[in-house]
Amino acid sequence: MTDTETVLVAGGQDWNEIVEAARGADPGERIVVNMGPQHPSTHGVLRLILEIEGETVTEARCGIGYLHTGIEKNLEYRYWTQGVTFVTRMDYLSPFFNETAYCLGVEKLLGITDEIPERVNVIRVMMMELNRISSHLVALATGGMELGAMTPMFVGFRAREIILSLFESITGLRMNSAYIRPGGVAQDLPPDGPTEIAKAIADLRQPLREMGDLLNENAIWKARTQDVGYLDLAGCMALGITGPILRSTGLPHDLRKSEPYCGYENYEFDVITADGCDAYGRYMIRVKEMWESIKIVEQCLDRLRPGPTMIEDRKLAWPADLKVGPDGMGNSPEHIAKIMGSSMEALIHHFKLVTEGIRVPAGQVYVAVESPRGELGVHMVSDGGTRPYRVHYRDPSFTNLQAVAAMSEGGMVADLITAVASIDPVMGGVDR
């Protein structure tokens, strides 16, 4: 082999034909185009550097970093409890998963995982599954819009509005609520919370059926998604791909089953898989997972029992029954009485908890949850102080974007849109 000889090693799709064509192609026939970072089909500020020959993508590379927020670095300067407010803003379409993963890590470092009240775990599971539905609705709605199916977009966003309104009534915010806290949740469900949740689930059934009726057997939709964005099991394992992309290869990998957390082992649900390794299989997985999430939420409502929503150790956890005063300003008299009405020591503990934060024993842990996009992991390091020494997130969108080249090179430019939509990346989680 000479120094000038080019060696290309690749696999999947029609790579052999691509290599043969590349050897005899005139370099002048190829052009490099930038798709994004401002483009309606890249799911945010994702830049795709494409080398194309006619309508064929010969090389695809991702350019990221346009939404960098420095959240992981900011966590090193905030108390452990304050960190929830930051992490909820990373993958902004599934904030409850960011919060839960963070809190599970803090609780594991504190050694209080087994002390979390049952009601807290039920509420966490319920909020995560509602969030899974809302996230999948955005994936299907935007994916349909990018391929020219406008009606599913309207159906999906109207259905998502039901869930966001529910989040607002429970947490006070539609998104990024910082509701999950180390040791519990910020506050209990409102008195009519279970009734509102049951009504929301009932209202979601019709739009979910309508979404399936529009696309499941739609000939145009199937032509645009079947055998497009192909990535088999070997490719997924080599790249560390998880979530619906991995399950579209037929492997039933779901952390809720393989490594249960928050009591998921107590719920009955199926891990949805497909065997096409393509965009259509990922679409069907998301459709069916929404119905499985509804099953889980219904079981949560059955398991919901009265009880505390925060661990009882007031040296570790803020009170979870914060109420605003009758004038709309400050804390309510009941809340103030609970903080300082028992003893001066109780007031001192509360003051130190708010002004200094909790001290977490030195150590490091890794905790992962099954987000709508795959394995969302947190590597958390404590030096024994009141702030994290380091918190690193393994965001599935970042990992899954590695598959863009394998899914799209050798295919048409139009199929690249399908491949990216089937990955469903959220750039807030990619760049952090």
Swiss-Prot record:
One of its GO terms (molecular function) is NADH:ubiquinone reductase (non-electrogenic) activity. The keyword NAD applies. It is a peripheral membrane protein. The keyword Translocase applies. It comes from the Bacteria. Signal peptide: none annotated. Pfam families: Complex1_49kDa (PF00346). It catalyses: a quinone + NADH + 5 H(+)(in) = a quinol + NAD(+) + 4 H(+)(out). One of its GO terms (cellular component) is plasma membrane. It is an enzyme of class 7 (translocase). It is found in: Cell membrane. Transmembrane segments: none annotated. Keywords: Cell membrane, Membrane, NAD, Quinone, Translocase, Transport. Its EC number is 7.1.1.-. Belongs to the complex I 49 kDa subunit family. NCBIfam families: NuoD, PRK06075.1. NDH-1 shuttles electrons from NADH, via FMN and iron-sulfur (Fe-S) centers, to quinones in the respiratory chain. The immediate electron acceptor for the enzyme in this species is believed to be a menaquinone. Couples the redox reaction to proton translocation (for every two electrons transferred, four hydrogen ions are translocated across the cytoplasmic membrane), and thus conserves the redox energy in a proton gradient. This is NADH-quinone oxidoreductase subunit D. The gene is nuoD.
